Amino acid sequence: MASLDSLVIFLFSTLFVTIVSSETPCPNFKSIISFGDSIADTGNLVGLSDRNQLPVTAFPPYGETFFHHPTGRSCDGRIIMDFIAEFVGLPYVPPYFGSKNRNFDKGVNFAVAGATALKSSFLKKRGIQPHTNVSLGVQLKSFKKSLPNLCGSPSDCRDMIGNALILMGEIGGNDYNFPFFNRKPVKEVEELVPFVIASISSTITELIGMGGKTFLVPGEFPIGCSVVYLTLYKTSNKDEYDPSTGCLKWLNKFGEYHSEKLKVELNRLRKLYPHVNIIYADYYNSLLRIFKEPAKFGFMERPFPACCGIGGPYNFNFTRKCGSVGVKSCKDPSKYVGWDGVHMTEAAYKWIADGILNGPYANPPFDRSCLRSEIKKESLYNQSTLTQACVKL
């Protein structure tokens, strides 16, 4: 009987791919606290910008698919964090900067497009010019300053942070993008990786000290598949490309390098803080599977041009980007993986989010028992639909 019980438990956990260690906390998340860059920005860069110098994300066709107007998201619609919010039954997370009379009871977002993990002064000393001074450290300081308004007393704030799902990015991508855009040697950019990882780790550690119990920490994307890099580093040497994806192999190897170093550091933190649930989100492989089998996920075949752009083999031009006058989007963004040459479409982000939330691209997997019953039913229905129909959710 004991062996039969064990088998049943094993099969149950395998079917739903959601069981985490019994030592980890299992809250019904009451809010989402977010840090990061454009992958998670829901309007902060727009909020921080001069009204006469707004970023392209403040203009159509950004936001056309779901919100039907620009929201400051670097996407045609929802981003990964929006699908995470839906999954845990919370509202979309509002941006903190530039917000007036916003309700942050269910979440607050400090992610800013262009943000780096490292201080701007650190990068400038190395000849790297970031587009914003709002680094991860600045975001954390802003969060601390906001606490009296968000939660009141220290004990209330500790409870709030402890009951939140804390999303750590993606962050660090811009620390690498800026030097790569200037064609810095890969070995030189690799030297930044330990510093980027240390910045992410120290921020997590500080938030744990403030009461944080559940963290979702994404790795790097397969940047060799990004339209901006395929355009910038276009070459006639076919050996530079992965024949299974059409992506630049050396850039993808760099993305893997960052992600592997991050996973090592997260394992170290787990040993130091066994009461904290630190979930690694494998953005790399959750997206790479789409490039390997685009038709399976409802996307057009290679060469994976940007939906919104103009010119060149990938529909991308550095001087006339999406959101600029005269630059239009494609008729059906759901058939495209890439949105504007740098970021993905809502359709691609939904698949990435599904890979994280429903498996197998989160370690440890999300614990479905943490979700309210109505959310569980909806997620299971969506997962079943996705598996049976194999169409875009």
UniProtKB/Swiss-Prot annotation:
InterPro entries: GDSL, SGNH_hydro_sf, SGNH_plant_lipase-like
Protein's UniProt name: GDSL esterase/lipase At1g28600
EC top class, as a word: hydrolase
Cleavable signal peptide: 1-22
Homology family: Belongs to the 'GDSL' lipolytic enzyme family.
One Pfam match: Lipase_GDSL
Keywords: Glycoprotein, Hydrolase, Lipid degradation, Lipid metabolism, Secreted, Signal
Transmembrane intervals: none
Example GO biological process: lipid catabolic process
Glycosylation (residues): 133, 317, 382
Active-site annotation: 38 (nucleophile), 340, 343
GO CC entries: extracellular region
Domain of life: Eukaryota
A GO molecular-function annotation: hydrolase activity, acting on ester bonds
Organism: Arabidopsis thaliana (Mouse-ear cress)
Enzyme Commission (EC) number: 3.1.1.-
Compartments, as annotated in UniProt: Secreted
Cross-referenced Gene3D superfamilies: SGNH hydrolase
